[in-house]
Amino acid sequence: MQQALAGGAWTVLPDRIEAGTFAIAAAITGSRLLLQPVVPGHMQAAAEALRRSGVEVDLGAASMLVIPPRTGRLAPTDIQTAPHPGFPTDLQPQMTALLATAAGRSTVREAVFDGRVRHAQELRAMGADIRTADNRTLHVWGRPSCLRPGACVAARDLRGGAALLVASLAVEGATTIQECWHMDRGYEQLDNKLRAVGADIQRVPSPAITAAASACNNTD
């Protein structure tokens, strides 16, 4: 006998990738940041990677506190992505950006998605010393002040764009990120949330989009 469907209620889980992105942003800028709500069990792998890089991470019942390294410098560490509960592939580009500012060599191994290394080219344009060993492996030669102001880079995909945004926060000066709409697919008001904790971010229309909109508005 067919049964009728009934209504129900469900609480959406906090986004571990958004929380991890903010945690990495705090770490790369040497900032103290409290994130909540989070599910601690979902953040263990990201927290462990940050701890190996010298960052203090305190996971509470529903919170994550990120504290800058006591030494004032990030340490190199190796990471390899894996399905949950391993290190998330969707945080690999952001962590690569962070490791570019650590003092020493790190190796990043992408074991989930083939070819997820395109962000390395754009990070190199910002001054990072990243060498692509193959389409799954990056060798990062970190230097604390390697990222230069004035770069104009492009977000080729969602998480690669987040990596560029995280890296730009560590730059003393302006960085232009084109095609930032990629980030809107995976983050809700990312620029506004970062501004709320002190980031200087301005979203401006690209000339191509402005010209296209103007042409549409002038069409009879």
Regions found by a protein language model. Give the residues of each.
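Short, structured segments at the rim of ligand-binding sites
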Residues: M1-D220
